Each structure stands twice: as C-alpha cells, then as structure tokens.
Amino acid sequence: MSEGKSPVAPIRRGGRSTILRSPMLLLGLLAAQFAIAQLLTGVQFGDAPRNMHWGLLSFERPAYLLGEADTSERIKGFPPNPESLGPNGLWRGGYGGLHPWWGPVVPLIFASVWGVTRSYTLLQLVVPVAGGATVILTYMIARDLLDQRRALLAAAFLSCFPLFREYSSVSYTETISALWITAALLCYLRGRTAFTIFFGTLACLSKMDMLAMYSGIIVTCALWDVLRHEGRRPLAQHIAVLVFPLLIAAPWIWYHTLAAGHSAATQGISADLFRFLLPQMIELTFYAPWHIALLTLVGIGAAVVAGIRGRAMSAMPTMLLGAWIGLGILITLVYAATPRAGNSPRVIIPALPALAVLFAAGLFRLPPRVRHVLSVYLIALFTVVNIIVIGYESVRFGEPIRAAEPAFAALRETERGFVLTPLYWETLLYTRQPATWFEGDPDFEHNIMHNMTNFKVYIESNPIRYVLIPRTGDITSPEVRAYLARHARAIDSGEMTLYVITKP
C-alpha cells in the first residue's frame, strides 16, 4: 500500500451499489473505446496492414518466421529496363522478410487469431483489445499504489492520450508491447515471480526495444533494492525475473538478428537526422504545433514531478515507474536518430502506462488553481485532437479501404498474380494476392506510371497480372490509362478500377 494513499470518500446509504458499479462501468468504456473506434471506422494505415499480413503469412508459411523471404511482395518494384528508371535502386532489395527488430510473438498472435477464426474483423480487433487490457492493467497498478479515484484518472489519461488512442485503434504492435510490459511489471510489484517471467518473456520477444526496456527496469529496481538494503525482495527473485526472459529470448535474438547479419538498432545513428526528426516527433505526440506540444509536456511533467516529490507512493514503485518512463524516452531519442525509423513517436507507447500512473499520483498534489487549469486544458486538448484525428483518418484511410472492397472481392476470386497498386499492403492482406508498387521512390513511380512506353515494357517484363488504381486522379497519365483500356479487361469496382492484363 502507498505511503500517501488518501482515504476513500464515505458512501451515502442507498446509493452504494450504483456508486460501486459506476467506476467499473467507466473503466469498461475507457477500455472498449479502441474496439468501438475500429468497428465504426475500419481504419488501417501505414504499417498496420503489413503487420497483419505478416501474421497471416506466419500461419500460411511458418518458415517465414525462420527467415524465409516473403515472395508475395515487391513493394519497392521489380528491376526496370533500363535500370535508370528507378534511380534510387530500392528495387534491388528484392523480396522482403520479417523486420530484424521484431520478435515472433506478435506475428504468432495474428496467426493464431486468423487460424482459428478466418475473420478480418476479429483480426483487426487484436490490438484494440490489447489497448483496452493495457488500460485495465494501468488501473490495477494505480489502484494498488494509490486509490480508486486516482486509478481511474490514470486509466482515463492513458486511454485518451492522443498517441495511445490512435495506435491502439489500429494494428500497430507497440500497444501489444505495452500490454506485456505492463502485465509483467504489475506482477513484479505484486511479487508474482512466475507471471513476471512469463509476461516479461512475451515483452522481450515482441520487439528488441522491449528487451532493453524490460531488463533496464528490472536492473534499476534490483540495484535500488540492494544498495539501499531495503530487502523488499530476495535477490534471487530479481535475478530470476531478469535472467529467465533473457535466456528464453536469446535463441531468437541470435538466430533472427545476429546470425542473420542484421545490424544493431543503434548502428549508423545520425545527429543530423535526430535534429530533423525530434521536433516532428514532439508535435506528433499530441498532433499539435511544437509550442503547444511542449507546453503540454511541461504541464504533464509538472504533475509527474509533484507525484514524485510528494511521495505519493513508496520508493520502490516510484523508482520503477521513473525508470520505465526514462527508458521509454531514451529509446525514443535513439529511434529519432536511427536511419529508416520514421518520425512517429509511437515507440514511447509502452512507457505511457507509467506516465499515466505518475500523472495521476501528482495531479491532486498541485495547487488547486494550477490543477484546475491543467485539467481543463488537457481535457479540451485531448477531446479536440481525438475527434479531429478520428474524423480525418476515417476519411483519409478508411474510405479508400471501403472503396477498394469490391476490387478486393474480385481479386479473391481470380487467378494468382502480382497486382500493381498503391494499396499494396491492403491488397496483400485482404486478397492474399501478391502485390507490387514503387514505395519510397517517386521518380521510379513517375517514370513508369506516366510514360506509356516505359509502362508497357515494365508490365511485359515482369509477372504483373493486375493493375488496381483509383478510377480518377493523377496516379497515372491519360496515355497509360488509354493503353490499359486497349490491352486489359477493366472491372469497374466503384471508386477503383481493376485491370486484368492480357498477355500473350
């Protein structure tokens, strides 16, 4: 129990059952919102379709997890003729495989759900369910360390935090990592060694950054316990929860990353890239201009500092939560300097449960006026940002998927062949047809899709059987569309047109 736990407010007679049920109802709504958003919008964007595709591929071809190439995707394109048409040379990479930073846990989860249900709806609910479970586990940690009121505050803060809400509604993997590490550290705080090892292993085998985060937190807590001679936990327990997950994860790390010749995540980090990406990552944390994002971080940080300085919890849990956040920030900073990492700050998502608990611990220790202003500001910001993001993504990403569904249905019924389409991951996922495009090379795309001669040679030289493009727009030139009209059978699929290439 925490040192600073406040007494529970008295319950009025006659309203006991309603008051006791309402916090659980609120918690359930907070946890369910991610699944509701996914069911209502159907949004998947960025790497989300790819992540699910890797799961289905792991079910269809288990050797994929052991390093076999994915021969169903050439998203960087086939070799052009002449090669100068693809000046960046990304097509030289050939067929792709499982990312070297990934562990086997997430693909196996997707594979299991698909293998049992064959349902895209349930497949797309895996991460939203994980997000809801993470909110509940965050509540449980805060309830153990604080009280019910602040535990609900922690759950609400996490579930409405724009970055967490967005990525817990689609099939990105950071929320699953957050689930495992939150479960592991809840068990660690409760002294459940076996369950800590189990969930810690799942965290370490989700992504390589989780191995660093989990082991760093445990080492920090063990050193704190030993150096302060508190003896809250036997040294053997610290060693067990640290060593066993690392030993279990070691064969995968050796086989999938080191022996395969993949470089470490920190190799080739760039200070110039860091200076370029970090401001963008700060803005994208709250989907706000940098000065508003920094102001928001200062306000949240003030509550966190108040919780730590006010000793709202005992020393060990405070140290654990602080190390959790600190390592999350460190991993994010390294990510910002890593080539090909992107500008998304989502790698900090597994540390957000700790931020939520410390925020809840400190908010009520701020001066009343400051607390009121900060609360109103965060409620307004989170509400406005989440509404805008949900609406934007429903139009920007949900509508193209819905528009392509007739074409996807037609492709599921046709012979196997590569599909040339800008919706390459979506096509791979929802049709199980191989797909290709010109990802990351707009010059390559323009040279092929806006020149009839180049397009003709490219199509004839490579195993492309279908072309799936929007019915209108400038994705291709009128000359290329005219060529397709003459040499392909068009299947009108609403907003999309599917061309079946006629080859000799």
Feature annotation, model-predicted:
Residues 10, 23-28, 198, 242-246, ...:
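Signature aromatic-anchored transmembrane alpha helix within multi-pass, membrane-resident enzymes
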Residues 28-30, 158, 200, 217, ...:
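Transmembrane alpha-helix segments characteristic
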Residues 34-40, 210, 335-338, 362-364, ...:
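Transmembrane alpha-helical segments
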Residues 45, 163-174:
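Short acidic/glycine- and proline-prone juxtamembrane loop motifs at membrane-interface regions
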Residues 137-140, 156-157, 176-195, 199, ...:
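Specific aromatic-rich, kink-prone transmembrane helix
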Residues 214, 234-299, 327-332:
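Membrane-lumen/periplasm interface segments of specific transmembrane helices
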Residues 222, 288-322, 328-329:
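Hydrophobic, aromatic-rich transmembrane alpha-helices
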Residues 378-428, 438-445, 453, 459:
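Membrane-embedded, lumen/periplasm-facing catalytic core of multi-pass transferases
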